[in-house]
């Protein structure tokens, strides 16, 4: 088995979408970065790598057995054993995983560029490890939705833009649940004032579909202003907004 040593990790907890596990250039100074003293390195087929990266489902039993208690974290000069922690790659993507004792990939992190390069060098002549696993699970019937946006809807966005776009759709999802024709009409007019007359004859569902389809694509200053207005007066959303806007970088 291959091992890496002195690996810096920035854990993102409970992330089912790989695009929210930020690469090194998007790490922030307020993130908590930890040092793995030792961690197993596994090369797996791409289908398994993407399953681990983009899901929070059960890991193969054989994989868990292979990495059991073979990782150590260093904190305050103390070396502590971890139950199930490993770095996994398909030769293209790289991900550190810690299950915090469970059997699903609860915490995920990217590596720093120097250590990514080391991973590529270490696995270039290594055959992917195959684990007994249900193929249908590997293919993952995961469905994206308004609270878990498809990768194409956040591609090219910075960490801050992704977070604010996801916040906007949390607020829109709440708006959808109210099923208030007057309110959805108001917010659609805020987004697209030129349609003020046309939407007077439309149903809630028709207006909602237009608002969703027009806001889901891309990101712009218009999206930003719309989100800021949409969340006003809602303490939970306002707190999330403030947290993102206190971070000037990324």
Curated annotation (Swiss-Prot):
> Taxonomically, what lineage is the organism?
Bacteria, Bacillati, Bacillota, Bacilli, Bacillales
User: Pfam family of this protein, just one?
Assistant: DUF3603
Q: Which family does it belong to?
A: Belongs to the UPF0736 family.
Under what name is this protein listed?
UPF0736 protein YjbA
Query: Which species is listed as the source?
Result: Bacillus subtilis (strain 168)
